[in-house]
Amino acid sequence: METTVGALGENTTDTFTDFFSALDGHEAQTGSLPFTFSYGDYDMPLDEEEDVTNSRTFFAAKIVIGMALVGIMLVCGIGNFIFITALARYKKLRNLTNLLIANLAISDFLVAIVCCPFEMDYYVVRQLSWEHGHVLCASVNYLRTVSLYVSTNALLAIAIDRYLAIVHPLRPRMKCQTAAGLIFLVWSVSILIAIPAAYFTTETVLVIVERQEKIFCGQIWPVDQQFYYRSYFLLVFGLEFVGPVVAMTLCYARVSRELWFKAVPGFQTEQIRRRLRCRRRTVLGLVCVLSAYVLCWAPFYGFTIVRDFFPSVFVKEKHYLTAFYVVECIAMSNSMINTLCFVTVRNNTSKYLKRILRLQWRASPSGSKASADLDLRTTGIPATEEVDCIRLK
């Protein structure tokens, strides 16, 4: 039966064309959301293929992606955990913007502690061989995909919230029920769109040179479903990249016009000027986050489009796998940038960590719940300008 071979994670996929050609007698369709081509069409005899995992370029790429995964586990794991803990403890942080940021934090935290260790084993330790079974293969693939879409949808929701708060300040702010519905929509849309990533993910035993076996973990689409695959990819590309980027760009362009190019009527007090400076800094930070998102993910989507719709471009490229690793590392680094911008910098995570540790240290083992609650209230975070900046009310 002809198959299409996808890769580990729809947002961190791989296509190892050098050893996929071992599927002799089959038409391999490879890609994050795979495309169709036959190795026989390009006269690539099996005995001329080499195991790219033993090359120097692959070794260098393995080191790079290993460093990226370690960085994600440390930055996203620790930073997002502290932010989520602080948000649970301090009520003054629970505004709409921070709740939307919490969606980013939760999704990136799950990827850092659940997916990254398995990917480290797959990419670096076992050099492109999966040893953890079909269920974990599909689960890791699915969680990575959901995390990407949650991040995209949350960034879009934050942009819309800033637009409404700054361009239409007299309109009532979003109620708790509406905010809960928005958060539910962010997750439900991401979960539904990512279902094919889990449904088509499976394991495939591949035999490379010298009869060495590699267990490939990724999406495998039947060749006769090529039209549906490409339609699905274009749908995802439009809904989870092009559409959100255009919408966020329009929102921040309108907000920037409001903050920088529109005269404020009346006499400007020091408090008004301080709030204006605060809003400008926050919007600049959000624009930087949007720019980082585009710079990190545009190469990945562009690489995927060329690979999936114009396979002849890469099929004989010697350093194709190394190029993919570079593109993938750039895309994965976006989660670290989000954590540093939203969690560590904007919310001063170290201050929250010190307060949480002090609270635990001061609470005696025999202390009552009432005294612990009093301790929590007395160590609450003051309404500083930094907190006002993130709230932007």
From Swiss-Prot:
Alphabetized PROSITE patterns for the sequence: G_PROTEIN_RECEP_F1_1 (PS00237), G_PROTEIN_RECEP_F1_2 (PS50262)
Coarse class of the protein's main subcellular location: membrane
Cytoplasmic side: 84-98, 168-179, 254-282, 344-393
A biological process from GO: coronary vasculature development
Localization, UniProt: Cell membrane
Keyword 4Fe-4S: no
Cysteines paired by S-S bonds: 137-217
Tissue: Expressed at high levels in the heart, skeletal muscle and pancreas. Expressed at lower levels in the brain, lung, liver and kidney.
Keyword Glycoprotein: yes
Record membrane topology: Multi-pass membrane protein
Gene Ontology CC annotation, any one: plasma membrane
Family: Belongs to the G-protein coupled receptor 1 family.
Function comment: Receptor for prokineticin 1. Exclusively coupled to the G(q) subclass of heteromeric G proteins. Activation leads to mobilization of calcium, stimulation of phosphoinositide turnover and activation of p44/p42 mitogen-activated protein kinase. May play a role during early pregnancy.
Name the UniProt record assigns to this protein: Prokineticin receptor 1
Natural source organism: Mus musculus (Mouse)
Organism phylogeny: Eukaryota, Metazoa, Chordata, Craniata, Vertebrata
Gene behind this protein: Prokr1
